[in-house]
Amino acid sequence: MKNIGIINCGMGNLHSVSNAISNIGFNPVIINASKDLVSFACSALVLPGVGSFDLAIDRLEKKNLIEPVKLWIQEDRPFVGICLGLQLLFEGSDEGSKPGLKIFNGYVSQFKHSLVKKVPHMGWNKLYFNRFNTIDNLVPHYFHYDLQPWAYFVHSYYIEPKDCYTFNTTSLTFYGKQKIVSSISYNNILATQFHPEKSGLFGLFILKRFLSSY
């Protein structure tokens, strides 16, 4: 059984992600330090989180996990970012002053009250897929342009990429008048603004198909 490392930032959804990983047939292991990546011989990494951008970066720094996580991604090893874990892949956030992991160009912005009903964006919302993206290479037969599944969201900030050509925008979501990039892919990265671990069978399917590909 493959070990799937779940990075512990102490930011919310560790338990539910661990249960989801177990339910789809993998062995979840909690990563608290860089040495855990080696000792657990992880096949993939998951970076979950809900809450403060700066606090998450601060905790990764204190656990000396910033560079190991960046190296893992740079080596094209399987990586899943969930909610805050997606946002941390970018340069920084309106929420604070700390730099992100800078895997992608762009920043994380707060919802504008003039465009949305209320903040945070919490609950179920529909995903829209682009028929010309390459998500079928990652989770074939389901993530497809003519299917519009629903997923569960909890967030007050959203990513604003500078250069969408550096990765594949695999799905969009609309909240009020605001368009949200709700999932992206790049090489061996799958990152979602929604919570697959809380999105029922659809969310579990996404995780299983991606993690089973490696």
Curated annotation (Swiss-Prot):
EC number: 4.3.2.10, 3.5.1.2
Pathway listed: Amino-acid biosynthesis; L-histidine biosynthesis; L-histidine from 5-phospho-alpha-D-ribose 1-diphosphate: step 5/9
Compartments in which it is found: Plastid, Chloroplast
Keyword Chloroplast tagged: yes
Active-site residue numbers: C83 (nucleophile), H195, E197
GO annotation terms (biological process): L-histidine biosynthetic process
Any Pfam family the entry gives: GATase
PROSITE patterns with a match to the protein in the record: GATASE_TYPE_1
Stretches assigned to coiled coil: none
The UniProt record lists the keyword Phosphoprotein: no
Molecular functions (GO terms): glutaminase activity; imidazoleglycerol-phosphate synthase activity; lyase activity
Function: IGPS catalyzes the conversion of PRFAR and glutamine to IGP, AICAR and glutamate. The HisH subunit catalyzes the hydrolysis of glutamine to glutamate and ammonia as part of the synthesis of IGP and AICAR. The resulting ammonia molecule is channeled to the active site of HisF.
HAMAP family for the chain: HisH (MF_00278)
Assembly: Heterodimer of hisH and hisF.
Protein name as annotated: Imidazole glycerol phosphate synthase subunit hisH
